[in-house]
Swiss-Prot record:
InterPro entries: aa-tRNA-synth_II/BPL/LPL, B3/B4_tRNA-bd, DNA-bd_dom_put_sf, Phe-tRNA-ligase_IIc_bsu, Phe-tRNA-synth_IIc_bsu_arc_euk, Phe-tRNA_synthase-like_B3/B4, PheRS_beta_core, PhetRS_B1. Its EC number is 6.1.1.20. One of its GO terms (biological process) is phenylalanyl-tRNA aminoacylation. Tetramer of two alpha and two beta subunits. The keyword Cell inner membrane does not apply. It catalyses: tRNA(Phe) + L-phenylalanine + ATP = L-phenylalanyl-tRNA(Phe) + AMP + diphosphate + H(+). The keyword Cytoplasm applies. This is Probable phenylalanine--tRNA ligase beta subunit.
Length: 566
């Protein structure tokens, strides 16, 4: 959860209330905001707050004060922003690196300069992903604008020369890394090129170079009254949302939309469209689990920054422009309950019968196996479910993540062994032998390409001369506790073991691997897994210098076999 630090004095002034710390904490908690700590910072009492990850509008005092004032006073405090179209135009040329832009203007602004800059930084860190997804530039419009259009374009760095923010002299584009502070170097790398940069230009003056820095030429100051805000990025929705947040939270006058002229289209930014949500009163009462009168529902929503209209049995709820966290009807139902107060919900039993919960049988069985493995000297691991595709060498068919955030998390694992190998790789300096195990789910695909979970038990043993015997003893001992007879068969001659044939060829040394079968007086001979000495190519891939013996067992299949006789 992102956090903010605000002055207690400023906070109380902004909500026009004299409240105790306990009263403030209770109000904040009702809105899903956690008071982390109350402390002094350079002689000033401050609140450190944890904000919900989807409430970017609350990451500054101004946004926080708006929701609390509305929560305390309802619709009487809501003021709709004055929005009009500006005569200012931005011409967007072909820009491939950060193709999406949105611009807007705050006229007659009266704002806290320190809060404004802090909020810009918070948006950069959160929704902006450290400026990789979104970067914000803010400018004093009166310092540079005289009627000509602003240009957004790509420029060769060797042709670039401008005076960056808070730097006394002009610098060349090729001097960015040497002349700018170290804290800006990470943003220079976001350009993706040592030869080209992106700029906003006005009348041959550079006003900003996103996502790195603005220019001294258009620097905003505490006395600035007309603020031009430009937002660039790789995702249009985020770019538009960030611009609206900056405009709405610090709007004390008029908001102006700016025309963006592209090669084949014209956009007006930001886009101030909101979706009205239509409910029946019965639908709302059914969802929340108790009866509420229409007027009460209306009041609850107005406390949460909605415009509400009731027509016959229908309720129409329109979120305010800054409620970007509203995605579906369920969010509005939640806001009704927040506005009503969870502490006010009646404690009646909503059902007429009672049930007894119990632990899932497979999980209970898994815990018993964990205890047995631990008593045999193995340390339990809990590794990541997502892997790099090259690490998941067990199968060619696997569930892939459609839009992975990183190459490290491209596919869902089909085996627990890669995770244990990665753990071994970074823990080779500990005392030998290193014995690790994991009991977790993997995700496999059936013949219809449908995914399903399987519970596996996997173990590895690494020491100077790992042998099959070490793993054999562990497996025999484990299944002896389950009253099952274990049999080991050479995989090469095991015609039934198609799944494991694919596995051993990639993981284990020939003639140092085996299939694992179990049976009992009322359980037929059943294949449950495999074991072997790990192939040196695997050691090389995961950079493990020690020999490894390993096993993998379909624990879910074992559970199905024995659950009827337990």
């Amino acid at each position: 959860m992102p956090g903010i630090t605000i002055s207690k004095k400023d906070f109380l002034n902004s909500i026009h209330q004299k409240l105790s710390d306990d009263e403030i904490e209770k109000i904040l908690f009702s809105l899903g905001i956690e008071m982390d700590i109350i402390c002094e910072d350079t002689g000033v009492v401050v609140y450190k707050l944890d904000i919900a990850a989807n409430r970017y509008d609350l990451l500054c005092l101004e946004g926080l004060a708006k929701i609390i004032n509305t929560y305390l006073h309802g619709s009487s405090i809501i003021s709709k922003p004055i929005i009009r179209k500006s005569s200012i135009k931005v011409i967007q040329e072909s820009v491939s690196k950060r193709p999406f832009i949105a611009c807007g203007i705050i006229r007659n602004a009266r704002f806290n300069y320190k809060h404004f800059i802090e909020y810009q930084d918070k948006l950069h860190q959160t929704i902006g992903r450290n400026r990789s997804a979104v970067a914000i530039g803010t400018h004093d419009l009166d310092k540079f604008y005289n009627g000509k259009p602003i240009k957004y374009k790509t420029i060769k760095l060797n042709k670039l020369c401008f005076q960056p923010l808070n730097i006394s002299t002009e610098i060349k584009g090729t001097e960015l890394k040497t002349k700018l502070g170290c804290h800006l170097h990470q943003y220079i790398d976001l350009l993706g090129s040592d030869e080209e940069g992106i700029i906003f230009e006005y009348d041959n003056h550079i006003i900003s170079m996103p996502p790195i820095i603005n220019s001294e030429f258009s620097k905003i100051e505490p006395s600035t009254t007309n603020i031009f805000i430009e937002v660039t990025g790789t995702d249009y929705n985020k770019v538009d949302q960030v611009l609206k947040l900056m405009l709405l939270n610090f709007n004390t006058g008029i908001i102006e939309q700016v025309e963006i002229q592209k090669e084949n289209s014209i956009d007006i930014t930001p886009v101030f469209n909101v979706t009205p949500y239509v409910f029946t009163i019965d639908e709302i009462c059914k969802k929340i689990g108790f009866l509420l009168q229409p007027d009460t529902i209306k009041l609850c929503l107005e406390k949460m920054q909605y415009a509400v209209e009731i027509k016959n049995d229908q309720l129409i709820a329109i979120p305010s422009y800054n409620r970007l966290d509203i995605i579906d009807k369920c969010d509005i139902i939640e806001d009704i309950l927040i506005g009503y107060g969870f502490e006010n919900i009646p404690l009646d039993n909503p059902i007429e019968f009672y049930t007894i919960g119990k632990e899932n049988d497979l999980n209970k069985f898994s815990d018993k196996i964990r205890e047995e493995m631990a008593m045999m000297g193995f340390n339990e691991m809990l590794t990541l479910t997502l892997l790099n595709k090259t690490e998941n060498i067990m199968h060619d068919y696997m569930v892939e993540v459609e839009y992975p955030k990183s190459k490290e998390y491209e596919v869902v694992r089909t085996s627990l062994l890669p995770g244990l190998f990665k753990t071994l790789s970074i823990n080779q300096n500990v005392k030998l032998p290193i014995q690790l195990f994991e009991i977790s789910d993997v995700v496999l695909l059936d013949s219809y390409n449908k995914s399903f979970n399987k519970r596996f038990l996997t173990g590895v043993c690494a020491q100077m001369n790992s042998k099959l015997e070490e793993i054999l003893e562990v497996i025999i001992s484990l299944f002896k506790k389950l009253n099952l007879i274990v049999e080991f068969t050479n995989i090469i001659t095991d015609s039934d073991n198609i799944f494991l044939k694919e596995k051993w060829e990639k993981y284990f040394i020939k003639n140092q691997t085996a299939s694992i079968y179990v049976s009992s007086y009322n359980i037929p001979r059943t294949l449950i897994g495999c074991l072997g000495v790990v192939h040196p190519t695997i050691n090389m891939q995961f950079k493990i210098s020690l020999p490894i013996s390993a096993f993998e067992i379909d624990l879910e299949k074992v559970f199905v076999l024995i659950k009827n006789i337990i």
